[in-house]
From Swiss-Prot:
Annotated organism of origin: Staphylococcus carnosus (strain TM300)
Any GO MF annotation of the entry: translation initiation factor activity
Keywords assigned by UniProt, alphabetized: Cytoplasm, Initiation factor, Protein biosynthesis
Pfam families: IF3_C (PF00707), IF3_N (PF05198)
Name by which UniProt lists this protein: Translation initiation factor IF-3
Length: 175
C-alpha cells in the first residue's frame, strides 16, 4: 500500500502555539507576539504566517507567501535527489577450479561493473568435496582482487558463508 506524506507545515490557523516569535517578510525580527496578533499582521500585508522552526521555544514563524515557500521546499528536495547516487551491487560467480580464460572473461565483466561505479561481489560456490579445499577458493578470490587493485579496493576480505566464499570490491572514489 502506498503511503502519502502529509504536509506537516503549520500555516495560519493551523498554528498550535499561543505565542510565537515573528519574523517579517524582509527578514527583520518583530518579536514574540500572540498568535491572533501575528495572524492579523500577516493578513494586513496579504501574506501567510508560516512556522519555520516548530521545535524552538517559542516557535518561530515567518510572514511569507506559503505557495512560494512550498515551491522552494520542493525545489530543494529535487536537488537533493539529483545529488544522491544509487550504488548497485553486482555479483560474479566463480568456481574454485576455474580455467584461466574463463577467469579473464569474468574479470573483464567485473572491471566493467567497477568502472561504472557499481560494487562487485565475487563469490565462489563449493560443490561436493571441494569445500575441504577452501584455500584454493581463497587464492582465486585474492587473485581477482589483485587484478582489480588499480580500480577497486577490497571492502570485505574473503569470507565463508555456508558453502560460499565471497569478497566485496568497491570502486575507488574519484576526487
Amino acid at each position: 500500500m502506498l503511503t502519502i506524506a502529509k504536509d506537516q507545515t503549520q500555516v495560519n490557523e493551523r498554528i498550535r502555539a499561543r505565542e510565537i516569535r515573528v519574523i517579517g517578510q524582509d527578514g527583520e525580527q518583530i518579536g514574540v507576539k500572540q498568535k491572533r496578533e501575528a495572524l492579523e499582521m500577516a493578513e494586513r500585508v496579504g501574506l501567510d504566517l508560516v512556522v519555520v522552526a516548530p521545535n524552538a521555544k517559542p516557535p518561530v514563524a515567518r510572514i511569507m507567501d506559503y505557495g512560494k515557500y512550498k515551491f522552494e521546499q520542493q525545489k530543494k528536495e529535487k536537488e537533493m535527489k539529483k545529488k544522491q547516487k544509487v550504488i548497485n551491487v553486482k555479483e560474479i560467480r566463480l568456481s574454485p577450479t576455474i580455467e584461466e580464460h574463463d577467469f579473464q572473461t569474468k574479470l573483464k565483466n567485473g572491471r566493467k561493473f567497477l568502472n561504472k561505479g557499481d560494487k562487485c561481489k565475487v563469490s565462489i560456490r563449493f560443490r561436493g568435496r571441494a569445500i575441504t579445499h577452501k584455500e584454493i577458493g581463497q587464492r582465486v578470490l585474492e587473485k581477482f582482487a589483485d587484478e582489480c587493485k588499480d580500480i577497486a579496493t577490497v571492502e570485505q576480505r574473503p569470507k565463508m558463508e555456508g558453502r560460499q566464499m565471497f569478497i566485496m570490491l568497491a570502486p575507488i572514489a574519484e576526487k
